[in-house]
């Protein structure tokens, strides 16, 4: 059964957080514009806030924070911790869930601990060679979306992929 929740936000003050400090800032700003339009179409009182870090101000009597910040700060638990601290409801998962989902190493450890099947993996910290056979995927563990992801099909591609990943994080998954 399809449900219509559009009336829930009509007249509510919604702080739409977008931008952020990460590499996904342009995508977040585009997403923010689309979300602002959609929220206004259902009657929400939308306040668009372009932020680049933890120093931002919410409008007084904000009813809801709609987080559309992708990647670092918006999805890594940092923003959620701030919002939990001021007691404002927000979209998405809480601080702990955000931290676990954003850090792919922490996620993999939890999957393994819970017995959830997942692809073979290892952590590289530099100067190591991988024990995983090619083809493989190399990724900085704390980047959002597909930032820094490399699908390595040939052995000669591995060095450049790892170099790029290490330019983004001190570990590679």
Q: What does each model-identified segment do?
A:
Residues 1-96, 100-109, 113, 125-129:
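ATP-binding N-terminal substructure of ATP-dependent carboxylate-amine bond-forming enzymes
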Residues 16, 153-173:
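Phosphate-binding site of ATP-dependent enzymes
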Residues 52, 69-72, 141, 155, ...:
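Anionic group-transfer/hydrolysis microenvironments
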Residues 109-118, 157, 164-167:
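Basic phosphate/pyrophosphate-binding loop/patch that engages nucleotide-derived ligands
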Residues 111-112, 132-149, 166-173:
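ATP-grasp fold ATP-binding core
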Residues 124, 149-154:
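Short beta-strand-to-turn element immediately C-terminal to the catalytic PLP-Schiff-base lysine
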């Amino acid at each position: 059964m399809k449900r219509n929740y559009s009336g829930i936000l009509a007249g509510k003050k919604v702080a739409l957080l977008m931008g952020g400090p990460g590499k996904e800032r342009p995508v977040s700003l585009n997403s923010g514009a689309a979300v602002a339009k959609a929220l206004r179409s259902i009657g929400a009182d939308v306040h668009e806030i372009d932020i680049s870090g933890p120093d931002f101000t919410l409008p007084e009597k904000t009813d809801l924070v709609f987080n559309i910040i992708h990647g670092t700060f918006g999805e890594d638990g940092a923003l959620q911790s701030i919002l939990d601290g001021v007691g404002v409801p927000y979209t998405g998962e809480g601080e702990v869930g955000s931290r676990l989902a954003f850090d792919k190493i922490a996620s993999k450890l939890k999957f393994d601990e819970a017995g959830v099947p997942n692809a073979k993996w290892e952590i590289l910290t530099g100067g190591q060679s991988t024990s995983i056979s090619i083809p493989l995927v190399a990724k900085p563990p704390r980047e959002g979306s597909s930032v820094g992801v490399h699908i390595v099909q040939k052995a000669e591609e591995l060095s450049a992929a790892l170099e790029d990943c290490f330019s983004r994080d001190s570990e590679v998954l």
